[in-house]
Swiss-Prot record:
It comes from the Bacteria. Catalyzes the reduction of the glycolytic intermediate dihydroxyacetone phosphate (DHAP) to sn-glycerol 3-phosphate (G3P), the key precursor for phospholipid synthesis. Sn-glycerol 3-phosphate binds at residues 102, 130, 132, 185, 238, 248-250. The keyword Cell wall biogenesis/degradation does not apply. The active site is at 185 (proton acceptor). NADPH binds at residues 11, 30, 102, 134, 249, 270. One of its GO terms (cellular component) is cytosol. This is Glycerol-3-phosphate dehydrogenase [NAD(P)+]. The keyword Transferase does not apply. It is an enzyme of class 1 (oxidoreductase).
Length: 320
């Protein structure tokens, strides 16, 4: 089975680099000039400078060429996934689609698996998620991810196809749990970053991380996810990484909020849109998610970090 990665950002490029260690891989960029530069210089200077592209990796802006491959990894931001699927529906028809994004669509409240099912019904789909940074994958550092697929046979095939020497995949059929874990941790990471940025200390971050994880479990259970999925790589594992590293864009965005510093809005911060989607879901479902709701308000500028923390600390006392 042949592989193409659609999306030449940092994560898409990193996946393509890793997979090219096993055989030919196509990386598609929607920008012809970027594709030409990457193909000629053998480097993604903009997103992953200093990391060479293997000889087995072909970069192209020709979507028809890329979609001749059997398995397509969709490395696009969550809020742009539906548009890409709709725009290129004919080219994607009949292919196996693996979403490589994390988040909840703002307008619909759906995750990547549901968006793919709604946009391209009948398509065989999966989700690649878990604790990882593009630089680590591209450098060949040991990384473990979750491959979520409702079809066990397809899941086994994809697990074997996409596992590399240093990228190990664990599979699950719980696509709901894997989707929610990868999405919700970004919201909590913004809160943890804001906490540290405002100088509130590691103890406060530990409290936010732990109580945030309780919110993740609460919503996931209500949506039908299995508890063990949230305890795995796509939930707790991703949460721990994202809430503690400056390499996380969501955590860095929170740091900037806490320090009252500007942040590059051109940088994709999935947790912002997800926080607003989660706040709406919480209202619709009548579920208590105070940290996620507060992060949404904080990202809007409705609160300062100090005001947000006071609001959380002044909530009614309860059992853990």
């Amino acid at each position: 089975m042949s592989i193409a990665v659609l999306g030449s950002g940092a994560f898409g490029t990193a996946l393509a680099i890793s997979l090219a260690g096993k055989g030919p891989v196509t990386l598609w960029s929607r920008a012809p000039e970027q594709a030409r530069q990457m193909q000629e210089t053998r480097e993604n200077h903009q997103r992953l400078p200093g990391l060479p592209l293997p000889a087995a990796l072909n970069v192209t802006a020709d979507l028809d060429q890329a979609t001749r491959c059997d398995t397509l990894l969709l490395a696009v931001p969550m809020q742009k996934l539906r548009g890409m699927l709709s725009e290129h529906a004919a080219a994607l028809h009949g292919r196996v689609l693996v979403a490589c994004c994390k988040g909840i669509e703002l307008n619909s409240g759906l995750g990547p698996m549901a968006v793919m099912a709604e946009t391209l019904p009948g398509t065989r789909t999966a989700l690649l998620t878990g604790p990882s940074f593009a630089q680590d994958i591209a450098r060949g550092l040991p990384t473990a991810l979750t491959l979520a697929c409702a079809d066990p046979d397809l899941g086994r095939d994809l697990q074997a196809q996409l596992t590399t020497t240093n990228l190990r995949l664990y599979r699950t059929t719980d696509t709901i749990g894997a989707e929610l874990g990868g999405a919700l941790k970004n919201v909590i990471a913004i809160g943890c970053g804001a906490c540290i940025g405002a100088g509130m200390g590691d103890s406060a971050r530990a409290a936010l991380l732990t109580r945030g994880f309780a919110e993740m479990q609460r919503l996931a259970a209500l949506k039908g996810a299995r508890p063990e999925t949230l305890m795995g790589l796509s939930g707790l594992g991703d949460l721990m990484l994202t809430c503690s590293s400056d390499l996380s864009r969501n955590y860095r965005f929170g740091l900037a909020l806490g320090r009252q510093e500007p942040f590059d809005r051109a940088t994709t911060v999935e947790g912002v849109a997800t926080a607003h989607a989660v706040a709406q879901l919480a209202r619709d479902l009548g579920i208590d998610m105070p940290i996620s709701t507060t992060v949404a308000q904080l990202s809007n500028g409705d609160y300062s970090v100090a005001e947000a923390m006071r609001s959380l600390l002044n909530r009614p006392l309860k059992e853990e």
